[in-house]
């Protein structure tokens, strides 16, 4: 299985070094030919920075893609990613630590952390800041974020610290998400709204996406965030209605999430709305299609679909690894249903490449439309 975070890379390095240190004495007793082979052989960099398997090898993959009873599926080649490296990755990581900020990229062990944090020639380096601490009051069975009934109190300096960090990075698109805080009166809506305000004060041109909780269905809290000055209102339904009780915390459900998305658009019609669905949890094609239709009927603008990845053995097992071709099919379905933007792929996540040109242009067009009215 490919390693998906820097901590895992460090762990691998220490294990390799430990084994090497234990075998130094044995090395001296090897024949010269074997010594030469080991000396000229690959090192750690050859494993972590080499090219990933190309598409031509995907067709030859013979492993099971659907889980049988008592089985744990092996990771197919199209889900293997590179270990995050580079100057921009390290810069973002260091800034976060210095300001005591958290990202969902790290806490949820996202496989795209190197790609999003690293940016690229045509991409915006994007880190999804996780507000209100790193401990959630809910226990969804797919999520690796820490949980507790009474997490530490909110940090009143977090909104300003977040704005300072984003200003230091020089980003033009930022994603704010949060843990669920059912222990806070408004679910943290005021805290999120204040963070958006601080960001806009420091940089009025910055585009802000908020991936929010459901606030226990409190539409006043939804309204508070929707009217905060954000550009994209995101809230994830996570899976099809039929699997909600199996996958999400009992306090969450599909209808409640749909009301959140609809209300955000009702109070702020020009905001871009967005949601995400994980595949590979046991859903059927008919259920996925019906869910997509329901989301579009609720006037959701953007949809992302990605492969569910089991973060630890304590979490839900992967029922199926969906092929890249099937994800492409769902992207085409999304376009046919009228979503303004559909991102569908094995490694796509709700905040994946949030600063892509299309989404940025969509926000810009809506702002231009409003200014002309």
UniProtKB/Swiss-Prot annotation:
Species name: Rattus norvegicus
InterPro entries: Aldolase_TIM, Elp3/MiaA/NifB-like_rSAM, LIAS_N, Lipoyl_synth, rSAM
Localization in the cell: Mitochondrion
Superkingdom assignment: Eukaryota
Binding site for [4Fe-4S] cluster 1: 105, 110, 116, 351
Cofactor note: Binds 2 [4Fe-4S] clusters per subunit. One cluster is coordinated with 3 cysteines and an exchangeable S-adenosyl-L-methionine.
Binding of [4Fe-4S] cluster 2, residues: 136, 140, 143
Name of the protein this chain belongs to: Lipoyl synthase, mitochondrial
Disulfide cross-links: none
């Amino acid at each position: 299985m490919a390693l998906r975070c820097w901590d895992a890379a460090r762990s691998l390095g220490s294990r390799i070094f430990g084994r090497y240190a234990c075998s130094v004495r044995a090395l001296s007793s090897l024949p010269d030919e074997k010594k030469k082979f080991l000396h000229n052989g690959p090192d750690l960099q050859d494993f972590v920075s080499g090219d990933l398997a190309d598409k031509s090898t995907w067709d030859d993959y013979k492993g099971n893609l659907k889980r049988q009873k008592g089985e744990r599926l092996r990771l197919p080649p199209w889900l293997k990613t590179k270990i995050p490296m580079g100057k921009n990755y390290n810069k973002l990581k260091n800034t976060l630590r210095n300001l005591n900020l958290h990202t969902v990229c790290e806490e949820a062990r996202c496989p795209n952390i190197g790609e999003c944090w690293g940016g690229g020639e045509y991409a915006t380096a994007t880190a999804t800041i996780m507000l209100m601490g790193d401990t959630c009051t809910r226990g969804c069975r797919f999520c690796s974020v820490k949980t507790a009934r009474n997490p530490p109190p909110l940090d009143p300096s977090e909104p300003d610290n977040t704005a300072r960090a984003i200003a230091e990075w020089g980003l033009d698109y930022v994603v704010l998400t949060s843990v669920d805080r059912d222990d806070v009166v408004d679910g943290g809506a005021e805290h999120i709204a204040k963070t958006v305000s601080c960001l806009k004060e420091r940089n009025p041109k910055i585009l802000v996406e908020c991936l929010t909780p459901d606030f226990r269905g409190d539409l006043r809290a939804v309204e508070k965030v929707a009217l905060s000055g954000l550009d994209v209102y995101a809230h994830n339904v996570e899976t099809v209605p039929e699997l909600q009780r199996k996958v999400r915390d009992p306090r969450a459900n599909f209808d409640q999430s749909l009301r959140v998305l609809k209300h955000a658009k009702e109070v702020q019609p020009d905001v871009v709305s967005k949601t995400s669905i994980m595949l590979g949890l046991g859903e059927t094609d008919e259920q996925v299609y019906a869910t997509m239709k329901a989301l579009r009927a609720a006037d959701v603008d953007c949809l992302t679909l990605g492969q569910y990845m089991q973060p630890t053995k304590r979490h839900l097992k992967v029922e199926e690894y969906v092929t890249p071709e099937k994800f492409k099919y769902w992207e085409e379905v999304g376009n046919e249903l009228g979503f303004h933007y559909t991102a569908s792929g094995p490694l796509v996540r709700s905040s994946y490449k949030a600063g892509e040109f299309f989404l940025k242009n969509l926000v810009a067009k809506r702002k231009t439309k409003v200014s002309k009215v």
